[in-house]
Amino acid sequence: MHTLNKREFLAAGIGAGLGLTALRSASAQGKASGANNIRSSRRAKTTKLFRSPEGFPNAVAVTSEGLWIAEQKLSGSAAAQYHMAEPKDLTEHAWLVDWSGKVLKTVSTQSRNTSGMAVGGGYVWMCANQSPEGVFQVDMNSKQISHRQIPLGPSDNGGGCHGAMWHDGKLWIAALRLRGLLRVDPVSWQPEFFIPFYDAPDRARYHAMAWDNGAIWQIVGNDCKNHSQYRPALVKYDAATGRVMELIEFEPDSADPHGLAMNDGALISCDAGIHPGWENNDSPSSHWIFRIDLV
């Protein structure tokens, strides 16, 4: 199967019937040659808040009721990759907790290797990162409403997801196959807007995103072998143009950020406890929910 590169994706007829606005100017904005222009003197500092419920917390979302946390379970090839036993129960949960970590509500889903979540429109949107892939739309009583693949891919496999968010009635997906942030109408499931991932040799890992007053923050990081070698950063995009506005590196020995959400002007994240290439629970903040302050 041919995977479209960024130039092909933006130029090869995307606007012809797909309803997607191509951000050609954004495709070059994150190249390493321009990285110094956006690199900030600010730093991201992490502060632990509370431990997540059982399992691997791999996505977060904020609503008026509290904080939602998505559970990731490792099954099949993912369990083998991390040398873990196959779970007896493959159900992956979304927990609503208060700001002390007390569980207020649990929603059960059939998502697999959940790596993104949004909450909006009366539903939880759980994003799978292994077969059967796609986005699981589940109501607050754990009834599955739909299971649909990320748009612009094969009908049975739109690729993996590493983040999601809900804003103004639209679902945003961090689409790994497309290598960008894709805005989708949640009813028609038509793609509407696309922002290419920030592109730099030392930032090859992409995670979740959060809305911030007309801008979007996304977690990026480097491939490495352990927590001490990890250099995560926050990229800030202009949500209207896709232009990269700022790159903020985390302080050394910070928590390992996976999910991302905004709460009263502060970024909230989670440390799943597993990371490709690392020993399990190598991060000292494994399974913690934490706040990110920009200092």
Predicted regions and their residues:
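N-terminal secretory signal peptides and thylakoid transit peptides that target proteins
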Residues: M1-A16
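A short beta-strand motif characteristic of beta-propeller blades
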Residues: K45-F50, K102-V107, Q144-P154, Q190-D199, ...
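Conserved beta-strand positions in repeat-built beta-propeller and related beta-rich domains
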Residues: P53, I69-A78, E86-K88, M126-S131, ...
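Short loop/turn segments that connect beta-strands within beta-propeller blades
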Residues: D98-G101, D139-K143, D185-W189, D238-G242, ...
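A short helix->beta-strand "capping" segment at the edge of beta-propeller domains
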Residues: G34-P53
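A short loop-to-beta-strand structural motif that recurs across blades of beta-propeller domains
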Residues: E92-W95, G134-F136, G180-L182, P232-V235, ...
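Blade-level signature of beta-propeller repeat domains, shared across WD40, Kelch, NHL, RCC1
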Residues: A261-V295
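Beta-rich, blade/repeat-based domains predominating
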Residues: E54-V62, S111-G120, G153-H167, A200-G214, ...
